[in-house]
Amino acid sequence: MLISLGWAALAATFTFSIAMVVWGRNGDGSINF
């Protein structure tokens, strides 16, 4: 259970970071890194 929860959190973080990079490269001025 705990391991599955950890993998789910890791996948969510990875997906979120990828989405941030994609949105950042789309020229959206509201998100700047």
From Swiss-Prot:
GO cellular component: cytochrome b6f complex; plasma membrane-derived thylakoid membrane
Stretches that traverse the bilayer: 2-22
One record GO biological process: cytochrome complex assembly
Signal peptide: none
Bilayer topology term: Single-pass membrane protein
Compartments where found: Cellular thylakoid membrane
Iron is among the record's keywords: no
Keyword Protein biosynthesis recorded: no
Alphabetically ordered keywords of this record: Electron transport, Membrane, Photosynthesis, Thylakoid, Transmembrane, Transmembrane helix, Transport
GO molecular function, a single term: electron transporter, transferring electrons within cytochrome b6/f complex of photosystem II activity
NCBIfam families cross-referenced by the UniProt entry: PRK02529.1 (NF002709)
Protein family according to the UniProt entry: Belongs to the PetN family.
Function recorded in the entry: Component of the cytochrome b6-f complex, which mediates electron transfer between photosystem II (PSII) and photosystem I (PSI), cyclic electron flow around PSI, and state transitions.
Oligomeric and partner information: The 4 large subunits of the cytochrome b6-f complex are cytochrome b6, subunit IV (17 kDa polypeptide, PetD), cytochrome f and the Rieske protein, while the 4 small subunits are PetG, PetL, PetM and PetN. The complex functions as a dimer.
Protein name, per record: Cytochrome b6-f complex subunit 8
Species per Swiss-Prot/TrEMBL record: Synechococcus sp. (strain RCC307)
Gene designation per UniProt: petN
